[in-house]
Design a protein with these regions (language model features):
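Bacterial Sec-dependent N-terminal signal peptides
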Residues: 1-21
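Extracellular glycan-recognition regions
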Residues: 20-215
Length: 215
């Protein structure tokens, strides 16, 4: 009976996905202009907005648009991002957020005329890592995988081949707000579109190991 239960849990864990529609998500710092159409979210990003805490620049901001739902446990999330980036630091991508002192944002960021794969990890203070692209890209897929106390961040140009851009710590066993983030620290705003948003549940690794040992 225990072996049967373990097998069923494995099947459910692999196949399950969160039933989340864009309409049921919610805003933190709602922008003035946004629209949900054909299972995609488009917005005009609020000018002079960003997420950053203290380090290097000496200031803290927490006022950029973030459209999210809350998930617990382990999961994989991905989204396709298309943006009309114009000003320095224009950015868009995924965000995983526990609170104002603990979050990860990852995506495309426009810096000094170049497109960068950018990740900011914040625990009390923020750090920033970038991978500069050789040429502009019309769109990009960003994927995050939360396992135990770590989040792996990946990017792709075709939703087939994914390359890791960051592995970062994030407290486990606590719900996380997951969704679309866009910011415009220096400019007058820009248009961005998020589509093909998917969140897939992953079975808890520690629970599976316990079930395996106690089957």
């Amino acid at each position: 009976m225990k072996k049967l239960l373990f097998s069923l849990l494995m099947m459910i864990g692999v196949q399950a996905s969160f039933a989340q529609t864009l309409e049921k998500m919610q805003w933190f710092n709602e922008p003035e202009q946004w629209e949900i159409k054909d299972k995609s979210l488009s917005m005009f990003v609020t000018p002079q907005s960003d997420y950053w805490r203290i380090s290097h620049y000496g200031f803290t901001v927490d006022d950029a648009p973030f459209y999210y739902a809350t998930y617990g446990g382990e999961f994989e999330v991905k989204v396709k991002v298309t943006g009309d980036y114009k000003a320095r630091f224009d950015q868009a991508g995924l965000m995983l957020r526990i609170d104002h002192e603990n979050y990860i944002k990852a995506g495309i960021e426009f810096v000094d005329g170049k497109f960068n794969l950018s990740t900011v990890v914040t625990h009390k203070t923020s750090d920033w890592s970038v991978i500069t692209l050789d040429k502009p890209v019309p769109y990009i897929w960003i994927k995050a995988v939360r396992r135990l106390d770590a989040v792996e961040i990946f990017y792709s140009f075709d939703d087939k081949t994914y390359t890791m851009m960051r592995n970062a710590w994030l407290q486990d066993n606590i719900p996380v707000k997951v969704g679309f983030m866009a910011a415009c620290p220096d400019g007058g705003g820009f248009n961005v579109k998020f589509e093909n948003f998917k969140v897939k549940h992953l079975p808890d690794m520690r629970r599976l190991e316990w079930l395996k040992k106690n089957a």
